[in-house]
């Protein structure tokens, strides 16, 4: 995914959970992508719904301490993550939700609507639904398949 400094990438829960969880099979690709984006001074747009979903998932899968640590890192002033309110994008997200596969969540549709708003197809996430809907996602690890 080649990007310019002006073009943001939109964060999805899948990559943020992988980034915060060292035992996640996509931790290394998420960390590598985040490092490249940071070195390029690339902004990562963080939809507020994605922040909430990420903290909920981390709190349930790991613990509240892990979730709070992730929230602190994502919301740290000066970080590459830019928190954005999503209320004004709900109608566009609901239209996508109506038109896309049952496997696509409303939060995924919000991520896509935010990407459309920022005129980007780049998603900082691993879900194949993004690719199927015409967006570019991070390349997931194949290590878990090789270990099976």
Identify the role of each PLM range.
Residues 1-8, 112, 117-148:
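Acidic, PIN/NYN-like endoribonuclease modules and their adjacent C-terminal/linker elements
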Residues 17, 52-56, 94:
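Amphipathic alpha-helical segments within well-ordered protein domains
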Residues 40-44, 79-81, 119-121:
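Short active-site oxyanion
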Residues 56-84:
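Helix-adjacent hinge/juxtasegments
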Residues 82-122:
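Active-site neighborhoods of divalent-metal-dependent phosphate/nucleic-acid chemistry enzymes
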